[in-house]
């Protein structure tokens, strides 16, 4: 075996040197002693006594001691026959435009029985540093085909906005629907309702990463993408529940590295969907516990906020590059608790949230998106004349106001009875019912473009006389209020 050495500022790193100095195993971690010049995040090759090999990454360095996390698990590793080789490289993933339409495991290896990927580059999964001054503000809308998102929580290209869900709710179905229907919306002219819907063969792509999902869920996504023709623009990464927990730490980073290549080198507008970030946070907690770190809230590590930011902040747009990365991470809140550390910290980092509601789901309303706690902080830069339609913002505000009042009236009705309500209150109750049954409720394969959704919103707002539509300017009412709802 050839040994090479690289002089470093603090010692010498031995490339190719094999060590048999395993001093301990703790969960997914292996502790080594008497290592010359180990580097933080360096990749190591581990050979077991039976000849099988595994990969790991240096998590911690203390003098000649190194703590390595093993991606494939530590079962079978001992201190007598196991050898560890330090490569001198950080973890890189091969990337190529040919990755579109392919399925990979959580480590980035093809699992669709297709040919190996011919890489056009090898990129560090931690991503490249982006000069903050080179970032451009997210603008223009990504259309999901779902009315409650497109009209009331519009997503800008380059935005990061999570779906807050819980166990038993249809977040997987919503994610698959977004993958089927998502596309770019671009106004070609000022002529009303004239748009270009680019569904992505050329410059729109989706990177989908599933972490800790069961086999049934994985098969659902694969089957849905293949049967509905969206697979050709999707790169799918699957980390199953029976895969090593530690693999969940690298799966979103490999997915985002692929997205960065497609966006910034190939000029594509990439939508990244990450599910389930709660599984990622649990994997982070497991590694932290194995390292015997001081736990933070509910046992999660104190640095989880920073760690989540290294994932979410990779969304955005860069000056001089055509592409963009938009992120929709999906979280399942334990016990429907929005104050749980994972959704709580996610909400601080991201630019809004889309809330999936159990009460709506129990009433057979799909998608059960509750618009009141939902928010898109960058919506204003994605809508309006020249991007969607000039009445978009006013219609959204009026829908929010009327729905909130309708909810208050519904609560009051439960106390005083319907007989005590005014005629105006009854209008809000009528709006509340029709809003949930016609606007929120939408078939899983029912695609509405933004103009169809806006026209449907006007149909609902015409329940009220003009005098009650306080949030819409008179000029906009003159143009849209009396118009035929089918126009």
UniProtKB/Swiss-Prot annotation:
GO terms for biological process: actin filament bundle assembly; actin filament capping; ATP metabolic process; negative regulation of actin filament depolymerization. The keyword Ion transport applies. It is found in: Vacuole membrane. PROSITE patterns: ATPASE_ALPHA_BETA. InterPro entries: ATP-synt_VA_C, ATPase_a/bsu_AS, ATPase_F1/V1/A1_a/bsu_N, ATPase_F1/V1/A1_a/bsu_nucl-bd, ATPase_V1-cplx_bsu, P-loop_NTPase, V-ATPase_su_B/beta. Belongs to the ATPase alpha/beta chains family. It is a peripheral membrane protein. It comes from the Eukaryota. HAMAP family: ATP_synth_B_arch. This is V-type proton ATPase subunit B3. V-ATPase is a heteromultimeric enzyme composed of a peripheral catalytic V1 complex (components A to H) attached to an integral membrane V0 proton pore complex (components: a, c, c'', d and e). The gene is VHA-B3. One of its GO terms (cellular component) is vacuole. Non-catalytic subunit of the peripheral V1 complex of vacuolar ATPase. V-ATPase is responsible for acidifying a variety of intracellular compartments in eukaryotic cells. Keywords: Hydrogen ion transport, Ion transport, Membrane, Transport, Vacuole.
């Amino acid at each position: 075996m050839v040994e090479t050495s690289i002089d470093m500022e603090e010692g010498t790193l031995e490339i190719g040197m094999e060590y048999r100095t395993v001093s301990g195993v703790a969960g997914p971690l292996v502790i080594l002693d008497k290592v010359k010049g180990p580097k933080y995040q360096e990749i190591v090759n581990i050979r077991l006594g039976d000849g099988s090999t595994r990969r790991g990454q240096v998590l911690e360095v203390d003098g000649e001691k190194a703590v390595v996390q093993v991606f494939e698990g530590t079962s079978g590793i001992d201190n007598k026959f196991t050898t560890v080789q330090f490569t001198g490289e950080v973890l890189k993933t091969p990337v190529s435009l040919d990755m579109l339409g392919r399925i990979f495991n959580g480590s980035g290896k093809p699992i669709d029985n297709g040919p190996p990927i011919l890489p056009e580059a090898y990129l560090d999964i931690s991503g490249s540093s982006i000069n903050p001054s080179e970032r451009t503000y997210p603008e223009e809308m990504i259309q999901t085909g779902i009315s409650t998102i497109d009209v009331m929580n519009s997503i800008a290209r380059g935005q990061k906005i999570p779906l807050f869900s819980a166990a038993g709710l249809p977040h997987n179905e919503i994610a698959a629907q977004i993958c089927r229907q998502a596309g770019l919306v671009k106004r070609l002219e000022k002529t009303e309702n004239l748009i270009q819907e680019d569904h992505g063969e050329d410059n729109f792509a989706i990177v989908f990463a599933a972490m800790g999902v069961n086999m049934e869920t994985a098969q659902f996504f694969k089957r849905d993408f293949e049967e509905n023709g969206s697979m050709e623009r999707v790169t799918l990464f699957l980390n199953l529940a029976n895969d090593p927990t530690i693999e969940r730490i690298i799966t979103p980073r490999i997915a985002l590295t692929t997205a960065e290549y497609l966006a910034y080198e190939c000029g594509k507008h990439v939508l990244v969907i990450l599910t389930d970030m709660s599984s990622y946070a649990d994997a982070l907690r497991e590694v932290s516990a194995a390292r015997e770190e001081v736990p933070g809230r509910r046992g999660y590590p104190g640095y989880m906020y920073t760690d989540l930011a290294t994932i979410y902040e990779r969304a955005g747009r860069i000056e001089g590059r055509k592409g963009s990365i938009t992120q929709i991470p999906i979280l399942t809140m334990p016990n429907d608790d929005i104050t749980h550390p994972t959704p709580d910290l996610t909400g601080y980092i991201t630019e809004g949230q889309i809330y999936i509601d159990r009460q709506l789901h129990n009433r057979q309303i799909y998608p059960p998106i509750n618009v009141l706690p939902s928010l898109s902080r960058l919506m204003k830069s994605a809508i309006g004349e020249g991007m969607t339609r000039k009445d978009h913002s006013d219609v959204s505000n009026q829908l929010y106001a009327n729905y909130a009042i309708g909810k208050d009236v519904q609560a009051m009705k439960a106390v005083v009875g319907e007989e005590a309500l005014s005629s105006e209150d009854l209008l809000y109750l009528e709006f509340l019912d029709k809003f949930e049954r016609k606007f929120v409720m939408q078939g899983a394969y029912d695609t509405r473009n933004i103009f169809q959704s806006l026209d449907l919103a006007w149909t609902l707002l015409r329940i009220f006389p003009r005098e009650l539509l306080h949030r819409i300017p008179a000029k906009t009412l003159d143009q849209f209020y009396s118009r035929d709802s089918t126009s």
